[in-house]
UniProtKB/Swiss-Prot annotation:
SUPFAM superfamilies reported for this sequence: dUTPase-like
Entry keyword Hydrolase: yes
Protein name: dCTP deaminase
Keywords of the record: Hydrolase, Nucleotide metabolism, Nucleotide-binding
Enzyme Commission (EC) number: 3.5.4.13
Any Pfam family: DCD
Function: Catalyzes the deamination of dCTP to dUTP.
Subunit (UniProt): Homotrimer.
Positions annotated to bind dCTP: 107-112, 152, 166, 176
Known pathway: Pyrimidine metabolism; dUMP biosynthesis; dUMP from dCTP (dUTP route): step 1/2
Taxonomic source organism: Campylobacter jejuni subsp. doylei (strain ATCC BAA-1458 / RM4099 / 269.97)
Catalytic activity: dCTP + H2O + H(+) = dUTP + NH4(+)
InterPro entries: dCTP_deaminase (IPR011962), dUTPase-like_sf (IPR036157), dUTPase_trimeric (IPR033704)
Family as reported in the entry's similarity comment: Belongs to the dCTP deaminase family.
Amino acid sequence: MGLKADNWIRKMALEHKMIEPFCEANIGKGVVSYGLSSYGYDICVGREFKIFTNVNSTVVDPKNFVEENVVDFEGDVCIVPANSFALARTIEYFKMPDDVLAICLGKSTYARCGIIVNVTPFEPGFEGHITIEISNTTPLPAKIYANEGIAQVLFLQGDEKCDTTYKDKKGKYQAQTGITLPRILK
């Protein structure tokens, strides 16, 4: 399994629409960096957020998630409360090749501020916006800047194609747009 370089990422984005919109440069002056890097792609967080709240005294249950667990926010700067959590989405829409798995890692700019970003792997054949999990581990409110970098995606090409892609198995988050809350297939 090999890590893919900028020239491969550029070709796949421009010729096969693997990443849309796609930024060929790495933009970093005055912003949290985003765009193409040497061996990855720095994704941008969109303007829509779902911030977890305890106002309704609900319990977070991944098997029975209720919308009352979150409040919707849209804007250029999202304040994630102290020791709290938010969901967001990428600006970019991904179409993963059938022999490529992507891993997403948080950016050091946010990590050094106590902001931890989690994204599960983008499986071969996956298509959609990426839902981003943002955890504020600090005792202070924290800012997340929309339309700027939030994490870096690394692309790993398998030595051989898998038998069943995410698309083949009709994955529950396939073709998701916007922020997608937890789903359990029934």
